[in-house]
């Protein structure tokens, strides 16, 4: 999680230098806690479990939203219903949510990896619309921070 946080903070600072309004501290905290739900499960459900843990701890709503919206390029309401999740928004909306979600896609263990590698791996388990959302997030982040990933 520390690697995700470090990359997310770099991205947030890059965004701020480009004139975007970004809460860098929120990005850092959200990135450090984005996988807190893995204490309960290592499945996709860790996003909802993490949001529950964060609520129980009394964390700010902005942090809770980062935790529950970081999975993939977001989870649609239809997908959330199929997963049995509470009705809510599970797609990153704010710049801080998008930064953490994207940074998470570029880190494997403690190493930075190319987005193509992440997408290739996720393509084995996710349907095409979910992969398309990750590509869309990637394209949006390229416009915000440029190419911040490692070489292939």
Task: Identify the residue ranges that each predicted region occupies.
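His-Asp-centered metal-binding catalytic motifs of divalent-metal-dependent phosphohydrolases/nucleases
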Residues: 4, 22-57, 64-74
